[in-house]
């Protein structure tokens, strides 16, 4: 059995990927009732209590020294002949738009991650065009319910020998959702007037 006895699977063992994505969306919706950013409720509570940083200007730095670390990792594993598939996950686009880290800044970093992997011999599964898709991310940057289904599906493909296509993500198709109401109430609570 693949599951620990106390863990009950959310779907049947033979569920299709579409069924799993639908179930993941249901679970995500049930766990993000307290806010419009699809951030899991316990994390949102910490944000509201000012126990998590809202100002995150240090993130999405195109000149981060971590890019050299990534390059070295990809080159080393490629030279060793390792069968590695890197996964580039998005951030929560609606949340980052709200706190002032705009889409173009995030996309520049996503593109640099993608090119660093590909240009150094790596294969990448790029999910960064899903930063506005509900429940792919569970807070600001951590993979969420639906995101895990995408990753699991790609792992299964990879294990079956189906390599990802190292294509460039078309960010023009990844548009922020239309705002249906004013962010004023959230802004006032967080002191971002």
Give the label of every model feature segment:
Residues 71-84, 113-124:
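A structural motif corresponding to the C-terminal end of an alpha-helix
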Residues 74-101:
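Active-site segments of SGNH/GDSL-like serine hydrolases
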Residues 96-193:
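Long, positively charged, glycine-interspersed low-complexity recognition regions
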Residues 48-53, 88-91, 114:
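Generic detector of short, locally flexible boundary/turn motifs and exposed helical patches
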Residues 57, 65-66, 85, 94, ...:
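Long, well-ordered mid-to-C-terminal structural blocks that present hydrophobic/aromatic surfaces
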Residues 14, 41, 92, 142-145:
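Intrinsically disordered regions, especially transient/low-confidence alpha-helical propensity segments
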Residues 1-80, 174-193:
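Secreted/periplasmic serine-hydrolase-like ester/acetyl group-modifying domain
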